């Protein structure tokens, strides 16, 4: 379902942002 994809993408984007901040 499209909504599930959006949620997954949002979570992945947040994880990437956190990793960037941690570096």
UniProtKB/Swiss-Prot annotation:
Residues covered by region (Disordered): 1-23
Biased segments, Basic and acidic residues type: 7-23
Superkingdom of the source species: Viruses
Function of the protein: Gp22 functions in head assembly.
Protein name per Swiss-Prot or TrEMBL: Major prohead-scaffolding core protein Gp22
Gene: 22
